[in-house]
Structures are given as structure tokens and as C-alpha cells.
């Protein structure tokens, strides 16, 4: 059940069930959509844990808890939140036509992710495809053995993964390494005196969050913090590619600024922001920002008492820890896609559960770490990865997913949606899912394009 699983997650963070907790789940559990994986249970549990963490923060601020309600269908729909976005009545384009599954010479199947231009160009170049068509790429991939092209794509700084069964993945060296990790962890990385939560009329009011993330999981974490009162400043680099449609899904409540860390002025600007930040969330591969001088330990030196949050594809331990990856890739290499279809004809899940749940867990870890800072002091590091979420979902077992829906009934879906007007025009998108009795979640500002705001706190 979702409630039991929510408390299982919280117990991993040393937060036990309390007598004044009020956590209610409505509507049915799995299957909501057509999948054998228990994504409704997992998503609902993660959001339920967030609700209780918000209640804990409110109790620290206002002296009383809150009642939390989670609609399981809304929670499950939130795992495909990007598919519900409309901009001026139109659905933004999100997937490159070359992205997808390709057969290899030895009878395996390779998934290639080509949504970023440099990954697309790299996949064509490395595979030997002469032109940018699916037919040419399929012909090129068919000349490679599966493990060979997987290694070549990864070694070339591109993104792809070989479809594996659950059995093959659990025996893989990285699968073995990840199996030893918790779902998420929070570790103390520095000393600092206790710091009370900032004053404010919302659980995260007054909390300042630097959001240095790009693809879905990290931006989702920032959105959850923003909808509960945090001041979230999304920092992007002007020279890096970005999928604008992600902002229309996850940018609500945030301001967006440019900083170029290749320039000394950019480093100085970010250091200045860190000096006044409560949270520093980053979604780059392990070691990437550290090479620019922003390791968690250095950030904690700049701002004792800060909460650092690291979100990556493959975790912080194991042979693939520095490998590039996205939700769709991790689904395929860990066996989720093979179970959704077959090993020969894999299918990705109807939800991006790894991205969104990783984002929810990052937000949860942030909230728990803020409570620890208020009560114990210290600087803290929260670590979450897509592959750890995949292992968690797999651990919940499978069901007969054929009874699930391709889509929620129109009237039910309409009740989960909201509309906003802003720099992107007229947007339709999902409402916040976690319902709190005292401080309902809302977005204080509409989503805005990258670089719309100055790189400074309000």
C-alpha cells in the first residue's frame, strides 16, 4: 500500500511514524496506466512522504502539523506531467525523431537518446550513419554488436544503452554496486550551528534554492520546493542545449538566470549566490561541477549550513557512476523496458517514473535535511539517482498491467489541470499534487524562459 511504502521511505531517513501524522490516499492503486510496474504506488508513496516532510517543517515553524492528502491518480499522472503541457493550445515538441530502439548485429536492441543536438550528431558519427534518418541510423547500428556500440556511444560522450533483462542487469557490475545503495541518502559534510527555518507563511517560505539542473528530475525537485514557498533561482549556462518544453512543465514558481562558469565573472557570481543560499541542487554528472570549483565540500565551506543535493543517472558508486544517462536509457538498461514489452521488442513505460520520482525524492531529502539543520546544525549532502529509483520500482514487483488505462477519463484529467499566463503565453499544465490542510501549494509566478531574470536573490 502507498501509506506503508511512504513510511518505509521516511524510515530510511530516520523519520518514524508519529501519532499526530495525518496521511490519506484517495482513488485506486495500480494499475492506473498500462504497465506491469507499480508506478502508482511508488509515485504516490514518494509524494506522501513529501507531504509528511512538509508537515514536519510546518510544525517546526508554526507549532502544529498538517493533514496530507494524495490523489493516487493525480500522483501517477504527475509521472507523465510533461505530456499534459499545452502552449497556446499546442503540444510542445519534445522527442527527436531519431531517438528510440535499434537492432544490433548480434540480435540485441540498443536505445539511443538524441534529443540534444550534440548527442544526435555524436550518435550518427559514432555509429557510422551517413545521414540523419532513422533508416540510415538503423542500417549503421545493425553493423555493430550490442555491447560494442553501447561502449562506443558512452565512450564518445553520447547517450544510449543496451536493452537488458532484469536478470542480466542484476548480475551486471553496476547493477551489483547499485543494489547496495539506499533509495536516497543524506550525509553530513560539514559543521555549522543550528539554523532555524526562515520566517514565512508557507513551509519553505524564505528558503533560497539554487537550481543548477537541466533535464526533468532536478527541475521537478525545484518545482516542488517552489510550490511550497521556496525562492528558487534556476541557473543555466547560455552555451549548453536545453529543452524549452521542460521549463513549461517544471519552471512554475521559479526565476531563471544565466551564469557561464567558463568565465571568472560567472564563478564569482555563483559564489556570491551560494553565500546567501540555503540549498544548492545540481543535476550534472558526478565531478562535473567539482571541476569548476563547486564540489559539495567547497560549497559547504562557502556557506556553512547549506544543503547540497546531487541528482544523477547512475549513482555515486560503481563503474558507471560517471556515465551519461536519462530516464529512457536507465529504463532500458535495468530491465524495466524489457518487462514493459519483451527483450526483443522492448517498450518504454507510459510514464517517466524515474525522472519524476527522483525529483520528488530529491525534494524530500532537501526538506528532511532542512529540518536536521534546524534541529542539529551542520551542512548536508542529499544523493539521489535514476538507477536507484529503477531498483526501487523493480523491488515492488510486477502486476498484470493490461487492465490499466491509456489515459485518464477526460473529466478526471481536467480536474487535475490548471492554466497560467506568462512569458510562454497561455500554458495548460498539472496542478500541484500534494494537498496540505493549512498551506495549500501554489505557484507564486508563471514559468519563464531561461535567462529572463538577473542572477541575484530577490
What are these regions (language model features)?
Residues 210, 255-301:
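A structured beta-alpha segment of the ubiquitous adenosine-cofactor-binding alpha/beta core
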Residues 179-180, 250-253, 324-329, 400:
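Short, hinge-like loop/turn segments at secondary-structure boundaries
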Residues 1-239, 267, 275-276, 296-315, ...:
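Acyl-CoA thioester-binding alpha/beta core of soluble enzymes
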Residues 321-338, 343-367:
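Active-site PLP attachment segment
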Residues 230, 234-261, 269:
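Glycine-rich phosphate-binding loop and adjoining beta1-alpha1-beta2 segment
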Residues 229, 253-254, 277, 326:
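Short, well-ordered alpha-helix to beta-strand connector turns
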Residues 291-339:
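Rossmann-fold NAD(P)-binding glycine/threonine-rich loop
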Residues 219-220, 230, 245, 261, ...:
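Domain-scale recognition of functional cores that engage charged ligands
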Amino acid at each position: 500500500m502507498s501509506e506503508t511504502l511512504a513510511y518505509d521511505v521516511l524510515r530510511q531517513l530516520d523519520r518514524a511514524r508519529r501519532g499526530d501524522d495525518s496521511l490519506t490516499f484517495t482513488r485506486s492503486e495500480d494499475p492506473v496506466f498500462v504497465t506491469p510496474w507499480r508506478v502508482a504506488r511508488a509515485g504516490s508513496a514518494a509524494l506522501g512522504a513529501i507531504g509528511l516532510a512538509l508537515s514536519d517543517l510546518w510544525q517546526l515553524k508554526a507549532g502544529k502539523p498538517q493533514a496530507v492528502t494524495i490523489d493516487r491518480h493525480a500522483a501517477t499522472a504527475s509521472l507523465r506531467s510533461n505530456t499534459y503541457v499545452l502552449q497556446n493550445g499546442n503540444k510542445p515538441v519534445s522527442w527527436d525523431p531519431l531517438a528510440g530502439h535499434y537492432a544490433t548485429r548480434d540480435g540485441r536492441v540498443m536505445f539511443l537518446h538524441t534529443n540534444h543536438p550534440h548527442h544526435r550528431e555524436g550518435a550518427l558519427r559514432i555509429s557510422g550513419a551517413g545521414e540523419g534518418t532513422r533508416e540510415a541510423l538503423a542500417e549503421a547500428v545493425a553493423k555493430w554488436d550490442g555491447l560494442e556500440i553501447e561502449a562506443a556511444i558512452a565512450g564518445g560522450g553520447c547517450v544510449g544503452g543496451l536493452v537488458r533483462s532484469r536478470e542480466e542487469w542484476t548480475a551486471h557490475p553496476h547493477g551489483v554496486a547499485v543494489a547496495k545503495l539506499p533509495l536516497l541518502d543524506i550525509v553530513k559534510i560539514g559543521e555549522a550551528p543550528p539554523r532555524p527555518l526562515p520566517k514565512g507563511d508557507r513551509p519553505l517560505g524564505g528558503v533560497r534554492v539554487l537550481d543548477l539542473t537541466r533535464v526533468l528530475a532536478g527541475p521537478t525537485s525545484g518545482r516542488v520546493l517552489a510550490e511550497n514557498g521556496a525562492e528558487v533561482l534556476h541557473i543555466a549556462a547560455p552555451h549548453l542545449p536545453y529543452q524549452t518544453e521542460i521549463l513549461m512543465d517544471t519552471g512554475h514558481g521559479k526565476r531563471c538566470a544565466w551564469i557561464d562558469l567558463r568565465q571568472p565573472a560567472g564563478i564569482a557570481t555563483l559564489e556570491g549566490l551560494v553565500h546567501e543560499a540555503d540549498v544548492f541542487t545540481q543535476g550534472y554528472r558526478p565531478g562535473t561541477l567539482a571541476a569548476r570549483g563547486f564540489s559539495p565540500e567547497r560549497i559547504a565551506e562557502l556557506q556553512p549550513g547549506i544543503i547540497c543535493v546531487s541528482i544523477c543517472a547512475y549513482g555515486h558508486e560503481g563503474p558507471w557512476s560517471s556515465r551519461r544517462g536519462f530516464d529512457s536509457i536507465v529504463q532500458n538498461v535495468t530491465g524495466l523496458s524489457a518487462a514493459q514489452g519483451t527483450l526483443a521488442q522492448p517498450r518504454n513505460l507510459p510514464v517517466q517514473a524515474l525522472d519524476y520520482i527522483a525529483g520528488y525524492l530529491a525534494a524530500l531529502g532537501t526538506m528532511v535535511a532542512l529540518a536536521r539543520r534546524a534541529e542539529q546544525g551542520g551542512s548536508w549532502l542529499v544523493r539521489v539517482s535514476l538507477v536507484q529509483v529503477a531498483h526501487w520500482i523493480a523491488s515492488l514487483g510486477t502486476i498484470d498491467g493490461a487492465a490499466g488505462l491509456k489515459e485518464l477519463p477526460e473529466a478526471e484529467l481536467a480536474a487535475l489541470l490548471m492554466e497560467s499566463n506568462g512569458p510562454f503565453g497561455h500554458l495548460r499544465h498539472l496542478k500541484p499534487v500534494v494537498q496540505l490542510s493549512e498551506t495549500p501549494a501554489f505557484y507564486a509566478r508563471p514559468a519563464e524562459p531561461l535567462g529572463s531574470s538577473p542572477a541575484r536573490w530577490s
